[in-house]
From Swiss-Prot:
It comes from the Eukaryota. Pfam families: DUF4796_C, DUF4796_N. It comes from Homo sapiens. Disulfide bonds: none annotated. The gene is MKRN2OS. This is MKRN2 opposite strand protein. PANTHER family: MKRN2 OPPOSITE STRAND PROTEIN.
Length: 223
Protein backbone atom coordinates (compact mmCIF):
# COMPACT_ATOMS: atom_id res chain seq x y z
CA UNK A 1 0.00 0.00 0.00
CA UNK A 2 1.43 3.36 -1.02
CA UNK A 3 0.85 5.33 2.18
CA UNK A 4 3.18 8.15 1.14
CA UNK A 5 1.13 8.71 -2.01
CA UNK A 6 -2.11 8.79 -0.03
CA UNK A 7 -0.87 11.79 1.95
CA UNK A 8 0.83 13.68 -0.89
CA UNK A 9 -0.71 17.07 -1.68
CA UNK A 10 -0.55 18.80 -5.06
CA UNK A 11 0.70 22.34 -5.64
CA UNK A 12 -1.02 24.89 -7.91
CA UNK A 13 0.63 28.13 -9.04
CA UNK A 14 0.01 30.77 -11.72
CA UNK A 15 2.33 31.58 -14.58
CA UNK A 16 2.04 32.34 -18.29
CA UNK A 17 -1.64 33.12 -17.59
CA UNK A 18 -2.15 29.45 -16.80
CA UNK A 19 -2.72 27.35 -13.71
CA UNK A 20 0.16 24.92 -13.37
CA UNK A 21 -0.08 21.88 -11.10
CA UNK A 22 2.88 19.88 -9.79
CA UNK A 23 4.10 17.95 -6.76
CA UNK A 24 6.38 20.86 -5.78
CA UNK A 25 7.15 24.37 -7.05
CA UNK A 26 9.91 24.17 -9.70
CA UNK A 27 12.70 26.70 -9.89
CA UNK A 28 11.65 27.66 -13.43
CA UNK A 29 8.29 27.74 -15.19
CA UNK A 30 7.91 24.53 -17.23
CA UNK A 31 6.25 26.53 -20.04
CA UNK A 32 8.54 29.54 -20.53
CA UNK A 33 11.56 28.56 -18.39
CA UNK A 34 11.41 31.91 -16.55
CA UNK A 35 12.68 31.91 -12.97
CA UNK A 36 9.88 31.56 -10.42
CA UNK A 37 11.84 32.90 -7.48
CA UNK A 38 9.92 36.18 -6.99
CA UNK A 39 6.13 36.29 -7.24
CA UNK A 40 3.32 38.56 -6.15
CA UNK A 41 1.30 37.47 -3.14
CA UNK A 42 -1.72 36.65 -5.30
CA UNK A 43 0.48 34.37 -7.40
CA UNK A 44 1.82 32.42 -4.41
CA UNK A 45 1.48 28.64 -4.73
CA UNK A 46 -1.45 26.97 -3.01
CA UNK A 47 -1.71 23.41 -1.78
CA UNK A 48 -4.53 21.17 -3.01
CA UNK A 49 -5.53 18.80 -0.25
CA UNK A 50 -5.37 15.09 -0.93
CA UNK A 51 -8.91 13.66 -0.66
CA UNK A 52 -7.59 10.27 0.43
CA UNK A 53 -6.75 9.37 3.99
CA UNK A 54 -5.50 6.45 6.03
CA UNK A 55 -8.83 4.97 7.08
CA UNK A 56 -7.26 3.27 10.08
CA UNK A 57 -6.66 6.71 11.57
CA UNK A 58 -10.33 7.70 11.24
CA UNK A 59 -12.78 7.09 14.08
CA UNK A 60 -16.48 6.38 13.59
CA UNK A 61 -16.36 6.95 9.84
CA UNK A 62 -17.71 5.54 6.58
CA UNK A 63 -14.87 4.54 4.24
CA UNK A 64 -14.63 3.81 0.53
CA UNK A 65 -11.79 2.19 -1.37
CA UNK A 66 -11.42 0.20 -4.60
CA UNK A 67 -12.15 -3.50 -4.21
CA UNK A 68 -8.88 -4.14 -6.04
CA UNK A 69 -5.81 -1.90 -6.03
CA UNK A 70 -5.68 1.75 -4.97
CA UNK A 71 -7.37 4.95 -6.10
CA UNK A 72 -4.22 6.71 -7.27
CA UNK A 73 -2.64 3.86 -9.19
CA UNK A 74 -5.20 1.35 -10.47
CA UNK A 75 -8.72 2.73 -10.14
CA UNK A 76 -10.36 3.40 -13.54
CA UNK A 77 -13.58 5.09 -12.39
CA UNK A 78 -15.73 2.07 -13.25
CA UNK A 79 -14.37 -0.69 -11.04
CA UNK A 80 -16.19 -1.80 -7.92
CA UNK A 81 -15.76 0.06 -4.65
CA UNK A 82 -15.80 -1.54 -1.22
CA UNK A 83 -17.10 0.27 1.86
CA UNK A 84 -16.81 -0.14 5.61
CA UNK A 85 -17.31 1.49 9.00
CA UNK A 86 -14.49 2.23 11.46
CA UNK A 87 -14.67 1.74 15.19
CA UNK A 88 -12.96 4.13 17.62
CA UNK A 89 -9.62 2.35 17.11
CA UNK A 90 -9.60 2.52 13.31
CA UNK A 91 -10.56 -1.12 12.79
CA UNK A 92 -12.66 -1.28 9.61
CA UNK A 93 -15.81 -3.41 9.83
CA UNK A 94 -16.95 -4.45 6.36
CA UNK A 95 -19.25 -7.08 4.91
CA UNK A 96 -18.38 -9.49 2.10
CA UNK A 97 -19.13 -13.02 0.94
CA UNK A 98 -16.95 -14.12 3.87
CA UNK A 99 -19.19 -12.37 6.40
CA UNK A 100 -18.23 -9.35 8.49
CA UNK A 101 -14.50 -8.65 8.36
CA UNK A 102 -12.61 -6.57 10.92
CA UNK A 103 -9.61 -5.14 9.08
CA UNK A 104 -6.63 -3.67 10.89
CA UNK A 105 -4.93 -2.89 7.58
CA UNK A 106 -5.73 -2.50 3.89
CA UNK A 107 -7.64 0.80 4.04
CA UNK A 108 -4.65 3.14 4.03
CA UNK A 109 -5.88 5.01 0.92
CA UNK A 110 -9.58 5.66 1.45
CA UNK A 111 -12.25 8.30 1.10
CA UNK A 112 -13.54 9.00 4.60
CA UNK A 113 -16.91 10.42 5.66
CA UNK A 114 -17.20 11.17 9.41
CA UNK A 115 -20.42 9.88 10.92
CA UNK A 116 -20.42 11.67 14.28
CA UNK A 117 -20.20 15.31 15.27
CA UNK A 118 -17.05 16.00 17.38
CA UNK A 119 -19.09 16.69 20.53
CA UNK A 120 -21.12 13.46 20.48
CA UNK A 121 -19.18 11.84 23.32
CA UNK A 122 -22.06 9.67 24.54
CA UNK A 123 -22.56 8.01 21.18
CA UNK A 124 -18.80 7.66 20.67
CA UNK A 125 -18.48 5.80 23.98
CA UNK A 126 -21.12 3.30 22.83
CA UNK A 127 -20.02 3.15 19.19
CA UNK A 128 -17.80 0.07 19.40
CA UNK A 129 -20.45 -1.96 21.25
CA UNK A 130 -23.17 -0.88 18.80
CA UNK A 131 -20.97 -1.80 15.83
CA UNK A 132 -19.93 -5.17 17.25
CA UNK A 133 -23.46 -6.13 18.30
CA UNK A 134 -24.83 -5.09 14.90
CA UNK A 135 -22.14 -7.07 13.09
CA UNK A 136 -22.81 -10.30 14.98
CA UNK A 137 -26.51 -10.38 14.09
CA UNK A 138 -27.71 -13.13 11.77
CA UNK A 139 -28.38 -10.67 8.94
CA UNK A 140 -24.68 -10.49 8.07
CA UNK A 141 -23.75 -14.15 7.89
CA UNK A 142 -21.65 -15.17 4.85
CA UNK A 143 -24.42 -17.13 3.12
CA UNK A 144 -26.73 -14.10 3.17
CA UNK A 145 -24.36 -12.01 1.06
CA UNK A 146 -25.70 -11.03 -2.37
CA UNK A 147 -23.74 -8.85 -4.78
CA UNK A 148 -26.51 -6.44 -5.72
CA UNK A 149 -28.97 -6.32 -2.83
CA UNK A 150 -27.28 -7.44 0.40
CA UNK A 151 -23.70 -6.28 0.20
CA UNK A 152 -21.10 -4.06 1.88
CA UNK A 153 -23.12 -0.92 1.15
CA UNK A 154 -26.28 -2.49 2.61
CA UNK A 155 -24.35 -3.37 5.75
CA UNK A 156 -22.86 0.10 6.22
CA UNK A 157 -26.05 2.02 5.46
CA UNK A 158 -28.16 -0.22 7.70
CA UNK A 159 -25.77 0.43 10.58
CA UNK A 160 -25.83 4.18 9.91
CA UNK A 161 -29.63 4.13 9.99
CA UNK A 162 -29.59 2.18 13.27
CA UNK A 163 -27.46 4.96 14.77
CA UNK A 164 -29.76 7.65 13.36
CA UNK A 165 -32.77 5.84 14.79
CA UNK A 166 -31.11 5.58 18.21
CA UNK A 167 -30.55 9.34 18.09
CA UNK A 168 -34.14 10.02 17.06
CA UNK A 169 -32.99 11.22 13.64
CA UNK A 170 -34.56 10.61 10.24
CA UNK A 171 -33.14 7.62 8.41
CA UNK A 172 -31.63 7.86 4.92
CA UNK A 173 -32.19 5.70 1.88
CA UNK A 174 -29.30 4.69 -0.35
CA UNK A 175 -29.93 7.44 -2.91
CA UNK A 176 -30.07 10.21 -0.31
CA UNK A 177 -26.91 9.09 1.46
CA UNK A 178 -25.02 8.64 -1.79
CA UNK A 179 -25.99 12.00 -3.29
CA UNK A 180 -25.48 14.03 -0.13
CA UNK A 181 -22.33 12.49 1.32
CA UNK A 182 -20.61 10.20 -1.18
CA UNK A 183 -20.92 11.87 -4.59
CA UNK A 184 -19.34 15.25 -3.62
CA UNK A 185 -16.26 13.47 -2.30
CA UNK A 186 -15.92 11.01 -5.16
CA UNK A 187 -16.11 13.90 -7.65
CA UNK A 188 -13.24 15.65 -5.89
CA UNK A 189 -11.34 12.39 -5.76
CA UNK A 190 -11.81 11.84 -9.50
CA UNK A 191 -10.37 15.27 -10.31
CA UNK A 192 -7.46 14.71 -7.95
CA UNK A 193 -6.69 11.33 -9.56
CA UNK A 194 -6.64 12.95 -13.03
CA UNK A 195 -4.22 15.64 -11.86
CA UNK A 196 -2.05 13.22 -9.93
CA UNK A 197 -1.60 10.79 -12.82
CA UNK A 198 -0.88 13.56 -15.33
CA UNK A 199 1.76 15.06 -13.04
CA UNK A 200 3.28 11.65 -12.38
CA UNK A 201 3.59 11.06 -16.14
CA UNK A 202 4.62 14.51 -17.37
CA UNK A 203 5.95 16.31 -14.29
CA UNK A 204 3.23 18.99 -14.41
CA UNK A 205 -0.31 19.71 -15.64
CA UNK A 206 -1.66 22.93 -17.17
CA UNK A 207 -5.20 24.36 -17.28
CA UNK A 208 -6.91 27.61 -18.26
CA UNK A 209 -8.08 29.22 -14.99
CA UNK A 210 -10.84 26.72 -14.07
CA UNK A 211 -13.92 27.66 -12.10
CA UNK A 212 -13.45 27.11 -8.39
CA UNK A 213 -15.06 23.86 -7.33
CA UNK A 214 -17.36 23.56 -4.32
CA UNK A 215 -15.81 21.67 -1.40
CA UNK A 216 -17.71 19.16 0.75
CA UNK A 217 -18.24 20.24 4.35
CA UNK A 218 -15.19 19.68 6.55
CA UNK A 219 -15.51 17.55 9.64
CA UNK A 220 -19.29 17.61 9.76
CA UNK A 221 -20.63 14.33 10.99
CA UNK A 222 -23.74 12.71 9.59
CA UNK A 223 -25.31 11.83 12.92
Amino acid sequence: MHCAEAGKALIKFNHCEKYIYSFSVPQCCPLCQQDLGSRKLEDAPVSIANPFTNGHQEKCSFLLRPTQGTFLREYDGRSDLHVGITNTNGVVYNYSAHGVQRDGEGWEESISIPLLQPNMYGMMEQWDKYLEDFSTSGAWLPHRYEDNHHNCYSYALTFINCVLMAEGRQQLDKGEFTEKYVVPRTRLASKFITLYRAIREHGFYVTDCPQQQAQPPEGGGLC
